[in-house]
Curated annotation (Swiss-Prot):
Name this polypeptide is given: Uncharacterized protein TP_0782
InterPro entries for this protein: Dup_hybrid_motif (IPR011055)
Alphabetically ordered keywords of this record: Signal
Superkingdom assignment: Bacteria
Entry annotated with the keyword Signal: yes
Signal sequence range: 1-21
């Protein structure tokens, strides 16, 4: 009975939605903070923070798209000085065909959507920037938020 239930459950899951996978946005993932990790005062981390420093500890690693998608928004740290600065710093947001969205934050400099061509689309693995110090995160790190 248990085997039949598991088989029916698997068929329902497979028929209900598509499976999706993303690539790591950096070559050698080294985490400073994990999703769901306690950050004190009962708060939990809402994303991954990668150590983005190179072997010399200076320049940040290249950050790449985790999957094929379209750049839908670019956030700049110094774009609007009259409003409260965002915690993401320089960031890009990509929408993917499967309904997922990926956010690449704390970049040294974020590319323009036009840098990806007239359709603002990018294949998986395209460099979108370099780990930086533009957000509320450690220097030379890269923030990959998730909710």
């Amino acid at each position: 009975m248990r085997t039949i239930f598991v088989g029916v459950l698997l068929l329902a899951i497979m028929g209900e939605g598509r499976l999706c996978a993303l690539e790591w946005p950096v070559d050698k993932p080294k985490f400073l903070s994990l999703f769901g990790q306690s950050v004190g005062a009962g708060l939990l981390q809402q994303g991954l923070i990668f150590d983005g420093a190179d072997s010399a500890g200076e320049r940040g690693y290249a950050v790449r798209t985790a999957g094929y998608g379209r750049c839908v928004m670019r956030l700049q740290k110094h774009r609007r000085a009259r409003v409260f600065p965002g915690a993401l710093g320089n960031a890009l947001i990509f929408a993917h065909e499967d309904g997922l969205q990926t956010v690449y934050a704390n970049l040294r400099e974020a590319k323009n959507a036009q840098d990806f061509g007239s359709t603002a689309e990018a294949e998986s693995g395209v460099t979108v920037g370099y780990a930086g110090s533009s957000a509320w995160a450690p220097p030379n790190s890269f923030v990959f938020p998730g909710d």
